[in-house]
């Protein structure tokens, strides 16, 4: 639960600030491809686990708890 909560808190920040401006709709469809920032990648950890190397590391650490 902690892992999800942590990622959720990061979600609105990176999404509303940077990604939201670019196009939040496209990110929902192809978020894995559009995600370039560490914030977006960490958020994708919940949806597309093990999509990016950095994403996988963050997911592993969070899920480890």
From Swiss-Prot:
Annotated GO MF terms: RNA binding
Compositional bias ranges of the Basic and acidic residues kind: 15-24
Biological process, per Gene Ontology: transport of virus in host, cell to cell
Region (RNA-binding): 17-43
Signal peptide: none
Record region (Disordered): 1-41
Pfam family name, one: Tombus_movement
Keywords, alphabetical: RNA-binding, Transport, Viral movement protein
Protein family membership: Belongs to the carmovirus double gene block protein 1 family.
Job of this protein: Cell-to-cell movement. Displays RNA-binding activity.
Subunit composition and interactions: Homodimer.
Protein known as: Double gene block protein 1
Origin organism lineage: Viruses, Riboviria, Orthornavirae, Kitrinoviricota, Tolucaviricetes
